[in-house]
């Protein structure tokens, strides 16, 4: 399940603020079939996305979005978005006040503790008619600490696929990418990263 609470507001004509006060994600696989288990064994990337996870996070996102030139045609557009997210500190504080030591769990699942920041800039320039030249820069970093040795799989970064470089398969380039020297390598290397 997933539940959250936050506020969105415009601080000016070109700027938007999003304050996510609390978001809770809980993933727990209750029962599986033999066919499902076989599929998970054959594809570790999919199996990672089904791991039990408890993520309690909060964050803030600032967006600047401005159209330059003729607004109707959106000749030029610049969008810059920066965000910071923290996970697990509220629960860690409660557990510390209660005197809990070791791995802290909620509903039998360890909760994640991490901090993550991202910065994205997109520039669009109308060349002729509906044709545009678009450039995008995205950078992000995340760090796990406290109750976690790594950030949750769903919070990690990857490159490729429909929302990134469409000419490349998802997770085939960028952070954590790996290309075996052997054509039929039986090893699997997870291809996500914290930067």
What are these regions (language model features)?
Residues 1:
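A surface-exposed, charged beta-strand/loop segment in the N-terminal or early-internal portion
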Residues 4, 14-195:
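C-terminal outer-membrane beta-barrel translocator/porin domains of Gram-negative envelope proteins
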């Amino acid at each position: 399940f997933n539940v959250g609470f936050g506020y969105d507001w415009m601080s000016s004509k070109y700027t938007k603020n999003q304050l996510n006060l609390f978001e809770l994600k809980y993933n727990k696989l209750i029962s599986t079939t033999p066919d499902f288990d076989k599929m998970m064994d054959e594809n570790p990337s999919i199996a990672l996305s089904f791991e039990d996870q408890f993520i309690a996070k909060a964050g803030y996102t600032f967006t600047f979005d401005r159209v330059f030139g003729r607004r109707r045609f959106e000749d030029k557009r610049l969008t810059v978005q920066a965000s910071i997210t923290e996970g697990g500190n509220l629960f860690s504080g409660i557990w510390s006040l209660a005197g809990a030591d070791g791995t802290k769990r909620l509903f039998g699942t360890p909760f994640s503790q991490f901090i993550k920041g991202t910065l994205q800039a997109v520039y669009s320039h109308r060349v002729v008619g509906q044709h545009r030249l678009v450039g995008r820069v995205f950078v992000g970093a995340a760090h796990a600490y406290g109750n976690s040795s790594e950030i949750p799989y769903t919070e990690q970064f990857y490159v490729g696929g429909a929302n990134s470089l469409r000419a490349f398969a998802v997770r085939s380039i960028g952070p954590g990418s790996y290309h075996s020297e052997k054509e039929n390598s039986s090893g699997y290397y997870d291809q996500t990263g914290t930067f």
